[in-house]
């Protein structure tokens, strides 16, 4: 991305269809960005292109102009069936596919072309019916498109004139390469169609794909002074793990009213960060793989409109999202991959705007920093963690978000993992119960009349042992999720809470025994505890 995102080259200087040129002008597009100025002369002549450009440079508009101009300037086959689209645009994520569709409709919606948006997570039959009715341009994610291709009568690519692969490097990262090859093999021969490939990096594997399925593609690179734009002001803090939330709240309180994205490495901890922000009075949305597609679209729309102040996300949102006006990007966790760092901070400072990227390098993820700095070819300025920053400034009263809880729906599996990890650190959370060695999360009851947080306990119940009297059921309260083997010392936070209730408590035929009582009653009890301990340690080691 250049510091001057627009060139002096006007769209009217190209031989574009008059209706397309009118649509571009009406949508506010008059001057080309550098990648558009490089792409259009070659692509409008019918050549294949392998283009490299960072996010936010205008490459989406570049290939949309080429696609729409080709379809308007040349008539389709007379015997083309409704299920035969003339153009195909592939995107790695649903969010990117939606954004491409919105951009296409913005300037091409009134040009007589039919656009079909195909992606997973929404009504399958409705999309299938849309394809059967016919579309000129199909914008799709690979998985859902393959589902329809295998049905034969829904969609066919036999007469497709132009194909676009956007974010090709991301296709590899997400494991879509087999799907892409499956789709490309169903297109016409490469000499009888035009193919445009765009990627943030033209790595060896991306170029290998280009040369295998494209017709002598011309390699185009939008030159940049650095991997990251100089308009992104980067800085990094080195907080302790327990300082990250206070530091985040302190920094946010000093930048009120700014549209902000916070990136977390795992969806397990997304909810914890989001809830901390929510309890601090911020209007927060969660974007991760566990949030249903319709809710994701709603969250993005509300964030775009300013109804949400902060979007907490995993890397599912790091690429392809065109959200205007993001002022701050926080890397709550440093990413493992240096490219992910570039794509994360690329959410801000788009198309010449300024932005800030603030990263936290805690002891868990600081190891990624040398690779990131080597990749971006610069040292990230270090800022000190001070007591003043750890104390958030006072905020005005929280306004209602008007739409219920915005923290998002995290899957039960993610909750189990979070509980287990906090359990291991000696901080019990939630109220899982144990049945046959499996930890599960149970809903608790509010202790304050419904207005406060749910307070529950973490409990582990052993199986009924056949060698013990049927009226005796041992119940052991476990404070940390780790049961020590017999004869070993138990740590301060790791131990068995032995509870006993009198038979006079009113529970007929049910006696709660202590560990010593059960051991005395049954010689097999130590092995049962050992099995439980091994089971829990095995569960924790998975995460």
UniProtKB/Swiss-Prot annotation:
The reaction(s) catalysed by this protein are: ATP + H2O = ADP + phosphate + H(+)
Q: Where is this motif: Q motif?
A: 9-37
All residue ranges annotated as the Helicase ATP-binding domain in the record: 40-220
Give EC number(s), comma-separated: 3.6.4.13
Q: Which keywords does the record carry? A: ATP-binding, Cytoplasm, Helicase, Hydrolase, Nucleotide-binding, RNA-binding
Alphabetized SUPFAM superfamilies for the sequence: P-loop containing nucleoside triphosphate hydrolases (SSF52540)
GO CC aspect terms: cytosol
List locations, semicolon-separated. Answer: Cytoplasm
Q: Where does ATP bind?
A: 53-60
Any one Gene Ontology BP term: RNA catabolic process
Q: What does this protein do?
A: DEAD-box RNA helicase involved in RNA degradation. Has RNA-dependent ATPase activity and unwinds double-stranded RNA.
Q: Which family does it belong to?
A: Belongs to the DEAD box helicase family. RhlB subfamily.
The name this protein goes by in its record: ATP-dependent RNA helicase RhlB
- Organism this protein belongs to: Xylella fastidiosa (strain Temecula1 / ATCC 700964)
Per the record, the gene is rhlB
């Amino acid at each position: 991305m250049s510091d001057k995102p627009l060139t002096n080259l006007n769209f009217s200087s190209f031989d574009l269809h008059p209706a397309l040129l009118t649509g571009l002008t009406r949508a506010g597009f008059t001057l080309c960005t550098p990648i558009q100025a490089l792409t259009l002369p070659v692509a409008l002549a019918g050549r294949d292109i392998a283009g490299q450009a960072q996010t936010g440079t205008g490459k989406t508009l570049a290939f949309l102009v080429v696609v729409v101009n080709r379809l308007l300037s040349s008539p389709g086959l007379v015997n083309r069936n409704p299920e035969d689209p003339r153009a195909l645009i592939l995107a790695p994520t649903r969010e990117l596919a939606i954004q491409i569709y919105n951009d296409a409709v913005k300037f091409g919606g009134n040009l007589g072309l039919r656009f079909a948006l195909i992606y997973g997570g929404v009504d399958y039959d409705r999309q299938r019916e849309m394809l059967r009715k016919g579309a000129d341009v199909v914008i799709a994610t690979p998985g859902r498109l393959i589902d329809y291709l295998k049905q034969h009568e829904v969609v066919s690519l036999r007469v497709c004139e132009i194909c676009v692969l956007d974010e090709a490097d991301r296709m590899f990262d997400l494991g879509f390469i087999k799907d892409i090859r499956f789709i490309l093999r169903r297109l016409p021969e490469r000499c009888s169609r035009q193919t445009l490939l765009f990627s943030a990096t033209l790595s060896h594997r991306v170029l290998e794909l280009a040369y295998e399925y494209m017709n002598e593609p011309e390699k185009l690179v939008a030159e940049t002074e650095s991997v990251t734009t100089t308009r992104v002001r980067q800085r990094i803090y080195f907080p302790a793990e327990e300082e990250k939330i206070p530091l985040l709240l302190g920094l946010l309180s000093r930048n009120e009213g700014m549209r902000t994205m916070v990136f977390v490495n795992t969806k397990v901890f997304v909810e914890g960060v989001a809830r901390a922000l929510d309890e601090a009075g911020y209007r927060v949305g969660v974007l991760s793989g566990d949030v249903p597609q319709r809710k994701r679209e709603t969250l993005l729309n509300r964030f775009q409109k300013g109804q949400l102040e902060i979007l907490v996300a995993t890397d599912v949102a790091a690429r392809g999202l065109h959200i205007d006006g993001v002022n701050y990007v926080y890397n709550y966790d440093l990413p493992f991959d240096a490219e992910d760092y570039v794509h994360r901070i690329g959410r801000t400072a788009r198309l010449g705007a300024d932005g800030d990227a603030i990263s936290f390098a805690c002891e868990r993820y600081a190891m990624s920093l040398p690779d990131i700095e080597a990749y971006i070819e610069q040292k990230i300025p270090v800022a000190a963690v001070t007591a003043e920053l750890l104390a958030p400034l006072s905020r005005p009263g929280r306004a209602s978000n008007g739409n219920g809880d915005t923290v998002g729906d995290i899957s039960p599996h993610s909750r189990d993992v979070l509980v287990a990890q906090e359990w291991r650190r000696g901080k019990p959370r939630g109220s899982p119960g144990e049945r046959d060695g499996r930890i599960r999360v149970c809903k608790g009851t509010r202790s304050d009349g419904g207005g406060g947080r749910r307070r529950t306990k973490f409990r582990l119940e052993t199986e009924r042992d056949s060698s013990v009297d049927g009226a005796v059921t041992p119940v052991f309260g476990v404070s940390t999720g780790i049961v020590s083997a017999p004869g070993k010392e138990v740590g301060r936070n790791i131990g068995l809470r032995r509870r006993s209730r009198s038979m006079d408590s009113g529970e007929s035929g049910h006696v709660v025994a202590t560990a010593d009582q059960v051991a005395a009653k049954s010689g097999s009890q130590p092995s049962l505890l050992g099995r439980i301990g091994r089971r829990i340690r095995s569960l924790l080691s998975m995460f």
